[in-house]
């Protein structure tokens, strides 16, 4: 089905969203506040959500496999989270000091993550990675950081490098060149950033050993979520841990997305103990949140007692009590049984999508782990950013719009997730709908 036909169908279904978009354009560039949620001809505006479903401004119901970009692990408006948030809101929305919920959430996270000996809260994953990088620089006395080509770690300047670069302009596969992701990123940031190729342990080791004396940290998304959910090859993360240990480089695990794959995140699943960890998304129950923590001797730089704190850490809404209450309620729901259900839903969905693709004989595949999945429109082996980068940008968009018009929400690039609010029937509906979309698009 052509993109024009899909767009026309979308316009017919979203007349109120179009009106709201035109109103929004008068006061906001692009009509909203998140680049990721925009798509042509305009984004649909969401009125409410409940369980695994959302309803847009036109009243259209959709099954939500986006989950606010993987953050709603319990689904929308989970009863225990709503109760906790409402109860706290009646006692106060924000305070000029800490609260009991902050302590309880910190205790829950440090129990789940043994590497996180101490933790502090912020308001987003971006703030979490920004502070983790700062802590690593303060502890090591070094200025450079290393990251992987294709990895996303938030929107602060220090990590907006080689997020989705054009391979023709970013050096060789084994020695990627740092490329600014956005206008406004200073050249000095590029000079302080070393870029590595995912899943190439030997190439990474060579680069790290050459730059080691200047590197404060290596920041890693263990699932490379931005590049297509590329599970690390056997021994790859272990090699990174060995090399960074030997060279005195802080290993930061960015688990803003990957924390949903087990009680102890990807570090538990893969058996790696990082020096620092960043969290966000699921730990706030749907409210704005971030956290960073790790080795106590590193985190001590944030301890203000006796004037010994090396790093000032402020934020009017850090550890907001309403957010903390939602986080505590969410963590209570994330039991071993809950993760077993999430894994089963993810396995069922990936198996179903694989069957659809095999029947269609179209060049595509699905990657992922636990409750996360990503549909790629290529059959080539996916190992790093360059191999997973789409060669045809329109095909993922056609899939997104086809699903959207048929009552299922994914992300525009193909990333999706299951929530605890879902059932096998919800997953089967996704697979059936995906099958119809593929069949209409040449399959």
Task: Give names to the regions the model predicted.
Residues 1-443:
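Conserved N-terminal phosphate-binding loop of PLP-dependent enzymes in the Aspartate aminotransferase
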């Amino acid at each position: 089905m052509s993109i024009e036909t899909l767009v026309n169908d979308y316009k017919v279904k979203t007349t109120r969203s179009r009106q709201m978009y035109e109103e929004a354009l008068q006061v906001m560039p692009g009509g909203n506040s998140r680049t990721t949620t925009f798509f042509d001809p305009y984004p649909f505006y969401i009125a409410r959500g409940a369980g695994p479903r959302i309803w847009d401004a036109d009243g259209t119901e959709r099954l939500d496999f986006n989950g606010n970009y993987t953050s709603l692990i319990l689904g929308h408006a989970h009863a225990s989270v709503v109760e906790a948030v409402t109860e706290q809101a009646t006692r106060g929305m924000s305070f000029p000091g800490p609260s009991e919920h902050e302590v309880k959430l910190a205790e829950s996270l440090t129990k789940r993550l043994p590497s996180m000996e101490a933790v502090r809260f912020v308001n987003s994953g971006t703030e979490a990675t920004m502070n983790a990088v700062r802590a690593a620089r303060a502890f090591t006395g070094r200025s450079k950081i290393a990251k992987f080509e294709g990895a996303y770690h938030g929107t602060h300047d220090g990590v907006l490098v080689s997020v989705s670069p054009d391979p023709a302009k970013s050096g060789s596969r084994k020695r990627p060149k740092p490329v600014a992701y956005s206008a406004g990123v200073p050249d000095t940031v590029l000079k302080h950033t070393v870029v590595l190729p995912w899943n190439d342990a030997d190439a990474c080791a060579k680069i790290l050993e050459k730059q080691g004396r200047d590197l404060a940290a290596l920041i890693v998304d263990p699932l490379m979520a931005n590049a297509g959910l590329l599970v690390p090859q056997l021994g790859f993360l272990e090699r990174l841990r060995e090399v960074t240990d030997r060279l005195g480089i802080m290993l930061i695990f960015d688990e803003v997305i990957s924390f949903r794959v087990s009680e102890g995140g990807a570090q538990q699943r893969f058996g790696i103990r990082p020096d620092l960890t960043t969290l966000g998304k699921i730990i706030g129950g749907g409210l704005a949140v971030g956290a960073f923590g790790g080795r106590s001797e590193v985190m001590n730089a944030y301890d203000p007692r006796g004037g010994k704190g090396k790093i000032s850490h402020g934020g009017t809404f850090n550890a907001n009590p309403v957010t903390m209450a939602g986080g505590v309620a969410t963590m209570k729901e994330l039991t071993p049984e809950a993760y077993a259900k999430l894994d089963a839903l993810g396995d069922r969905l990936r198996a179903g999508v694989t069957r659809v693709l095999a029947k269609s004989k179209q060049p595509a595949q699905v990657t992922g782990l636990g409750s996360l999945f990503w549909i790629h429109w290529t059959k080539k082996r996916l190992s790093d950013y360059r191999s997973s980068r789409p060669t045809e940008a329109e095909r993922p968009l056609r899939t997104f719009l086809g699903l959207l018009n048929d009552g299922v929400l994914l992300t525009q690039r193909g990333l999706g997730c299951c929530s605890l609010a879902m059932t096998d029937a919800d997953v089967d509906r996704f697979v059936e709908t995906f099958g119809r979309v593929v069949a209409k698009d040449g399959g």
